[in-house]
């Protein structure tokens, strides 16, 4: 059961006298002007820094630049879900259809909401998925499918002609982005909704940097302080904001496994989204694909895990170049690789007994849902590298409702 939040402390005893800005305030004021001072939580600062580089109108032939991790100064390329197409979309369509027939048919439509940041990718997957369903379903059944494409951030004036050639009822939702609209508005959807985040959302959900203070006997949140000359500095404060405290409550209900002083990135924005989905769309099913944080456990660590619970770790930050958070350059995107097993625990904790999810590799998911005829076709492609090999070698993972 989810732990009840304690009343928040009034944030009047900040160590900095700089005015506090949120991401929404930075958007409305177009940032911090020269000569102006500001204090911004690190998660809001990263979101502000990322924002111009996420919802771009990229075409289908845009080549993304590799980024580097802070741990190693070497290129790090994320796997592309389109390398698994169209087979992945066929398997996803089967998963959606089976769950729909088992749980919601014939009383409800099959409502699919794809939250996206990469519009060309979202359109391609939608086209593959809807084309497959069109080819396998009766007209009456196919008409019950309603597909909605919802941006993570506002993306204006998307031409509807981009949907030409996609069969069925497909809508581009432009006026109601997930952030900040859905996270701030009061609404309730009673119909069952299938929510997709397909390899272009989780890595861009901003994180808080936190640490547990033995002196304060409590958590501290990281802030970025900007002086009149535009110089930036990092500081930690025990006066944490609401969304950070919400994330901490979900992740660390047992502090016995917290290492004092250790800095951890926690998925604040993602937890906020999952909480909003749970409260406002209770009859939902979730399907997430992304690059997870993976570890190579030693024999000693495996033996320890049998004795004591697995400690909650930090997400891995991935930057365009070293220390790009505090640089004046704004040409790249800061990403995070999150431990999917921790996300599974977080999701199951938020939804308690009402809903649960499980984690598996993309290759295992496709293996469950591919048909023998599809396997035969993909295994013998004319002179090309078989797509099943690409899927088998993919580092992508799936977190989906059970």
Curated annotation (Swiss-Prot):
Belongs to the NDUFAF7 family. Present with 1100 molecules/cell in log phase SD medium. Its EC number is 2.1.1.320. It comes from Saccharomyces cerevisiae (strain ATCC 204508 / S288c) (Baker's yeast). The keyword Transferase applies. It catalyses: L-arginyl-[protein] + 2 S-adenosyl-L-methionine = N(omega),N(omega)'-dimethyl-L-arginyl-[protein] + 2 S-adenosyl-L-homocysteine + 2 H(+). This is Protein arginine methyltransferase NDUFAF7 homolog, mitochondrial. Keywords: Methyltransferase, Mitochondrion, Transferase.
